Amino acid sequence: MIVPLTSVSPAPRIDILLPAKERFSPSNAGAISGVVRDLVQASRAAKQFRIIGTAVKTSLMPEHFTGLLPKMRWLNGHNIGLAAAYLDLIHRTGSPDLVEVHSRCHVARYLAQKRPSLNVTLYLHNDPRQMKGGRSVSERRHLLRKLAGIICVSDYIRNCFLDGLDDCGDLASKVGVARNGAHRWLKQPPTKENFILLAGRMVPEKGILECATAIAQVLPHHPGWALIIAGAKRFEESAPGSYEDKIANAIAPLKERAKMLGFIPIADMRDWQARAAISACPSLWHDPMPKAVLESLAAGCALITTRRGGIPEAAEGRALIIESPSVENFANGFDKLLGDTDFRQNLQQIAWQDFPFTDTAMAEAADQLRLQALIGSR
């Protein structure tokens, strides 16, 4: 049975501590800031949250955000500096019932050590085995013992945290999953247009170059189709030899059938996603639970993606999953999607009709895990 966080009396106060590098602002919000905004907005207990981060001029959620400057960052580093400034803040204003540290294992440990009376949870957006304070089994075992709870964005990330902790017994129940979600902004299935949308951060691990190369090979055999790339610099802005420049060179033979839009506002991205018949999320690395996958499904796109990280948790049965990412395998996948109308439209229908990955579902799962942490600490 789901017990809402709002049912607890008195209403618990929950502080969310962002990584120091995050900028909780409309123009510079990173992936974690976006998830935190969605978590709070979609929660039935939204009024109970305070978001703490590095000070910005304009906040995404002014009514919830408190900006701080990292304390003695030249000595402590930015993340511990921000945590130290946070401890000063709660010394003045009083402690929350729960403080939720996002994606910084060593910060969660620092707060738990400095203020043992604090109920500290850790919200993991990435593999903790690659993080300071979480790389070793002994470090993660310490976190498991000392923290009130650990929330993971996918089963994949949960398994990463518990790697080597088979002997932890009942403590494993402290590690839960609140799978990333996306807001479905469309009220009915959109009319699709004949183009492929390739959107995401222009970094090698996202597989944009391999995917673009594959599309450049296949698209000439499918008249009437085009390619839109969002997230890279425009052609004229791509520095020679840069990753964006390599992508631009790969798709140059397509001429007017391919466009690189550069970084675009979220409203424009939603429009492209709604119109795209096909969306590609070609991650080469073990992506924990990319929002691009969820948004593509929310928009009813025929999605092509990879069996990496937490992606299959959302994409299995709803998308064309490339088992082993390569230019050749991507090309075969696109050839299938472009050439088989029934197959493509069936994926679009499934994506639209079977979409449980809402921001509301994410917030509800996270609130349940927060409640579990609060109850366990009493």
Regions found by a protein language model. Give the residues of each.
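Conserved donor-binding/catalytic core segment of Leloir-type glycosyltransferases
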Residues: 14-15, 151, 188-206, 211-217, ...
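A charged, aromatic-enriched C-terminal amphipathic alpha-helix characteristic of glycosyltransferases
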Residues: 186, 341-375
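Short His-centered aromatic/hydrophobic patch
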Residues: 101-107, 124
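Conserved acidic donor-binding segment of nucleotide-sugar-dependent glycosyltransferases
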Residues: 319-328, 335-342
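Short hydrophobic beta-strand element within catalytic cores of glycosyltransferases
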Residues: 302-305
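Nucleotide-activated donor-binding/catalytic signature segment of Leloir-type glycosyltransferases, i.e.
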Residues: 241-267
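A short, active-site helix/loop in glycosyltransferases that binds the activated sugar's phosphate group
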Residues: 133-134, 140-141, 145-173, 182-184
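Short alpha-helical donor nucleotide-sugar binding micro-motif in glycosyltransferases
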Residues: 263, 271-276
